[in-house]
Amino acid sequence: MGVDNLIQVFEDKYYIDLNGGILEAFGNLFSQNVTVLLYPMLKKDKLIDSNNLVVNNKMKNLYKFFKDNKKIIDIKDYNKKLLKIFSWKVLENIKKGKKDWEKDIPKNVSDLIKKKKLFGYS
């Protein structure tokens, strides 16, 4: 999972429909022996990983609990060239009909997206 996605996971607005809120969701997720392997990201040319990412102030202790218990682990062997590519941006470019999205993903994946007209490709 990418850092930007993990930050969103820690936003409690996504869990308002659950009786137990974010605690219920995280209890279900992590009770299944799930470990998040965290892919870093670049933000203003600074590498962000599990050690320096910032979550909502209300979630700091919950995040620290998962980090301290090795439920969130940094991926160390990552491709630096991929750090500036975001899935949401690729999807946005597909939907807008821009051609430059193809350079950001493997050719076999772009071929499949085009063949099956996935993600709004036309």
Regions found by a protein language model. Give the residues of each.
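Active-site cores that bind ATP or allylic diphosphates and position pyrophosphate for catalysis
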Residues: 1-122
